[in-house]
Amino acid sequence: MVHFTAEEKAAVTSLWSKMNVEEAGGEALGRLLVVYPWTQRFFDSFGNLSSPSAILGNPKVKAHGKKVLTSFGDAIKNMDNLKTTFAKLSELHCDKLHVDPENFKLLGNVMVIILATHFGKEFTPEVQAAWQKLVSAVAIALAHKYH
């Protein structure tokens, strides 16, 4: 289990309170699909993913990205209990969707980049470290049900 200090929690929640979940979620998932094109195979039903502009403009990518980032909101509310928070999502991604758990790490890293681009000077090394710790812990929690 990962332990977050009061300072780390404050760094994460402070930035999260300023986050536009809809915009950043679509951007994060879109960039994941562009930078790591093999991840597109999990989104066959999303329609046109033929180019970066098609991906970033795709309404299904934006909607699912919002859903993904909303689940990160659950992580922030439950930073001390991530394994339980993500148990059902872990099971879904493992047993039904068969998503390679490495993809959770990739998405987390993309999210950190999105935060850095959106928040500039507010995204200090301490804030980056707290967010990196959170996205890594979420990736571990999502991979928990894998055998």
Swiss-Prot record:
Taxonomically, which superkingdom?
Answer: Eukaryota
Give the modified residues of type Phosphoserine.
14, 51
What is an example of a GO molecular function annotated in this UniProt entry? oxygen binding
Entry comment describing in which tissues the protein is expressed? Red blood cells.
PROSITE patterns attached to this UniProt entry: GLOBIN (PS01033)
What does the subunit section of this Swiss-Prot or TrEMBL entry state? Heterotetramer of two alpha chains and two epsilon chains in early embryonic hemoglobin Gower-2; two zeta chains and two epsilon chains in early embryonic hemoglobin Gower-1.
Q: What is this protein called?
A: Hemoglobin subunit epsilon
- Name its species: Pongo pygmaeus (Bornean orangutan)
Q: What is the lineage of its organism?
A: Eukaryota, Metazoa, Chordata, Craniata, Vertebrata
The gene behind this protein is: HBE1
